[in-house]
């Protein structure tokens, strides 16, 4: 459906009891609704939240004015677990990309496919760190994730499935560890509460009382977590 020219993606799922509206990381609007919800019910729910939708879209546009596009040249900075490291182009390096001596060092012969090399580097490092941090967090839960993967997700930092599989975006390797912990904790709470119900947020608040501060960092700086 469209709302004053804005395309809205609608997804029906048996995991929802009410209609929920989300502004995704790429600025798209997504509606999750129960499978029993009629088109009129969904449209009325969207219309009722029209002001909030456009207010959030305006905020998204404001934040995304700082969107970055990095060049693979000497001195360019790249985020790595919350810190900026400058790029150094090297010759005859044993591996395509490594972090050493305070620099991200890229072998010159991989310049033509630098973006692919960086994505794989971040994916591997995110996988390692997320496995490590999840082990520290999962003791607080009775249900454990059945698997953890790191991929390139379209418009989310992470996702879960009813089979308790967790998937994270490789860009999570750019976030500070404290913010990464929030992303993990958020998905872990979904293992108990599938939807963003009041019970979900209460549980998240109990498990991580300062989650709002970490979430806000992600909202304010997520646009900078890019190549």
What are these regions, as identified by a protein language model?
Residues 1-181, 191-227:
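Active-site-proximal or metal-binding-adjacent scaffold patches in catalytic folds
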Residues 187:
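Walker B catalytic acidic pair
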Residues 184:
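Walker B beta-strand of ABC/ABC-like P-loop ATPase nucleotide-binding domains
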């Amino acid at each position: 459906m469209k709302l004053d020219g804005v395309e809205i993606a609608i997804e029906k799922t048996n995991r929802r009891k009410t209609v929920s509206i989300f502004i995704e990381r790429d600025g798209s609007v997504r509606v999750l609704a129960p499978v029993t919800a009629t088109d009129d019910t969904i449209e009325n729910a969207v219309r009722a939240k029209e002001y909030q939708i456009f207010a959030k879209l305006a905020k998204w546009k404001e934040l995304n004015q700082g969107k970055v596009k990095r060049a693979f040249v000497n001195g360019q900075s790249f985020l790595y677990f919350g810190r900026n490291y400058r790029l150094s182009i090297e010759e005859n390096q044993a591996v395509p990309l490594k972090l050493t001596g305070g620099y991200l060092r890229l072998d010159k012969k991989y310049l033509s496919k630098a973006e692919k090399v960086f994505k794989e580097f971040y994916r591997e490092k995110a996988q390692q760190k997320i496995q490590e941090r999840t082990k520290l967090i999962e003791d607080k839960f009775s249900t454990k994730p059945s698997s953890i993967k790191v991929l390139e997700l379209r418009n989310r930092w992470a996702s879960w499935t009813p089979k308790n599989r967790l998937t994270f975006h490789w860009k999570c390797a750019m976030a500070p560890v404290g913010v990464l912990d929030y992303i993990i904790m958020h998905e872990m709470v979904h293992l108990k509460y599938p939807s963003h119900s009041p019970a979900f947020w209460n549980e998240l608040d109990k498990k991580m009382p300062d989650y709002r501060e970490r979430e806000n960092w992600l909202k304010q700086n997520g646009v900078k977590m890019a190549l």
